């Protein structure tokens, strides 16, 4: 199922009073989630629950296009508003479900949604999906969908030095030869200049450092 609608005006994210805890939505708030509080203003809880059920069915792999039309007709919602709400709810749940329950606690989830000015009763409904009885099924579907993509099964590399000779100069030009074997049996071979290889090393080291810093901050939050 896909819902497409023009992006609503972005809302400024309220200051995070829990500065030592990283938002499950990431460092940059997705625009479709930022638009939700304004769009939810006049929406009754019964309609939101129908919309939420529809989004959950979509996350479980069901075709919900016909259900979207029924909801729009029954709730008398403009197509643009409904599409934006579905997109925002889908992104919000998808981001929350990608984290294991041990990393995202119910209180943290609820507090962060309240800071986005999402109504309290709707926060409760969203939390019931992320931490309720449907979670195992949603995790199972996500794993099956992720299994479609091949992953790296083996990685090898070596340094190769090409010797260039001429009447004027003789230079050694090192490069890194890489060989990737994927889980689907395919193999990739490519050559990387040493300068690019050093950039890759730096980028990987930076990501690992940031991941370690995030883990430490979340551990401090859990200890508090």
Swiss-Prot record:
Record-stated family: Belongs to the COMM domain-containing protein 5 family.
Cellular location(s): Nucleus; Cytoplasm
Modified residues annotated as N-acetylserine in this record: 2
Domain COMM: 151-215
A family per Pfam: COMM_HN
Key words of the record: Acetylation, Cytoplasm, Nucleus, Transcription, Transcription regulation, Ubl conjugation pathway
Assembly behavior: Component of the commander complex consisting of the CCC subcomplex and the retriever subcomplex. Component of the CCC (COMMD/CCDC22/CCDC93) subcomplex consisting of COMMD1, COMMD2, COMMD3, COMMD4, COMMD5, COMMD6, COMMD7, COMMD8, COMMD9, COMMD10, CCDC22 and CCDC93; within the complex forms a heterodimer with COMMD10. Interacts (via COMM domain) with COMMD1 (via COMM domain). Interacts with RELA, RELB, NFKB1/p105. Interacts with CCDC22, CCDC93, SCNN1B, CUL2, CUL3, CUL4A, CUL4B, CUL7.
Organism: Bos taurus
Function: Scaffold protein in the commander complex that is essential for endosomal recycling of transmembrane cargos; the commander complex is composed of the CCC subcomplex and the retriever subcomplex. May modulate activity of cullin-RING E3 ubiquitin ligase (CRL) complexes. Negatively regulates cell proliferation. Negatively regulates cell cycle G2/M phase transition probably by transactivating p21/CDKN1A through the p53/TP53-independent signaling pathway. Involved in kidney proximal tubule morphogenesis. Down-regulates activation of NF-kappa-B.
A single cellular component GO annotation: nucleus
Name used for this protein in its record: COMM domain-containing protein 5
Bridged cysteine pairs (disulfide): none
